[in-house]
């Protein structure tokens, strides 16, 4: 059975089960010649098929209509099989355990009233998680990305207000206090009934690709992942809504961090219209409620930039440190149990050792108060992540840092053993 592509109007062949079957007619075959854009494929929990340059994918719509539409008030939604399913919330609020203490509480969750209850097609709950994005079709955001693109390398150490030398120590002390207040729960995934660590990794990998496609700043990515983790620390989410939460998180982070954030319609587009603009805006509203509108949070990236300014290194070491730090975003366990300032210190140590065969300079030990012994546990976890990343299905970060502007640092091989004893 053939179907029509919603964006090109071309009849597409049936979709097969393997990676080679997920192809669509190229624009060259259609007689069109627009600039080629990166293709982000269909992702599943267990495997991500990486495609060679030039391959295109079929835009596959994997969610039923009832999954992604808000029902009218007072009406019930029928499942695809014509059976009335009991109403099910797309989100639930966790109640903190008494022993968690004030540190793990989620500000803003009390008193949240859900006026609209999501109706969920239960046939989808056990299916694979898919992310839909095909950049070969025409985007609603027809803006030349070079028009407003900033040189992030030029602004990182230049005009960034967190790097003002005169106030560096005071700013660092403030950020160290703030990172504790805005820390997600380290093991929140244990309380999630329908999503897994693997699904979160796929979502973060997809967010990295979205950031690269729209030339978003690195800090925007870190903020989006922070918003996502803090939201999931308080709310249980069904897998059919996980991408909606992630998209709302990067939309919110873009509005906060970017000078020229992509339009809301652009974020609807990157999900292949799986969610409506209304759904995305309402999810953004819910995200803000749960986060109590507290969006100014310290990230690993901010601390790393402070360290690099305090103790300068060569450009290769700097890029390698950024790459290693970004790898920590993929895994909630174990990296959420470490503070962002400590993860940044571990990333600095690992990159510095790989390039210069030194770990933690005395200058930074005095500035941060971290000794090498305190950094070692996180450093060991980051080292494992670096060794395993070539064999993982999530390759967006590695592909990003293969670029010449980062000096191909993701191709550098870390030593198998670190002399930490």
Curated annotation (Swiss-Prot):
Bridged cysteine pairs (disulfide): none
Modifications after synthesis and translation: Polyubiquitinated via 'Lys-11'-linked ubiquitin by the anaphase-promoting complex (APC/C), leading to its degradation by the proteasome. Deubiquitinated and stabilized by USP37 enables entry into S phase. Ubiquitinated during the G1 phase by the SCF(FBXO31) complex, leading to its proteasomal degradation.
Gene Ontology biological-process entries: cell differentiation; cell division; meiotic cell cycle; spermatogenesis
Subunit structure, interactors included: Interacts with INCA1 and KLHDC9. Interacts with the CDK2 and CDC2 protein kinases to form a serine/threonine kinase holoenzyme complex. The cyclin subunit imparts substrate specificity to the complex. Found in a complex with CDK2, CABLES1 and CCNE1.
Protein name according to UniProt: Cyclin-A1
Keywords associated with the record: Cell cycle, Cell division, Cyclin, Cytoplasm, Cytoskeleton, Developmental protein, Differentiation, Meiosis, Mitosis, Nucleus, Spermatogenesis, Ubl conjugation
TM segment ranges: none
Keyword Ubl conjugation: yes
Region (Disordered): 1-21
Function field: May be involved in the control of the cell cycle at the G1/S (start) and G2/M (mitosis) transitions. May primarily function in the control of the germline meiotic cell cycle and additionally in the control of mitotic cell cycle in some somatic cells.
Compartments where found: Nucleus; Cytoplasm, Cytoskeleton, Spindle
InterPro entries assigned: Cyclin, Cyclin-A_N, Cyclin-like_dom, Cyclin-like_sf, Cyclin_C-dom, Cyclin_N, Cyclins_cyclin-box
Keyword Plastid assigned: no
Disruption phenotype: ales are sterile due to a block of spermatogenesis before the first meiotic division, whereas females are normal.
Organism: Mus musculus (Mouse)
Classification via Gene3D superfamilies: Cyclin-like
Chief localization: nucleus
Family listed: Belongs to the cyclin family. Cyclin AB subfamily.
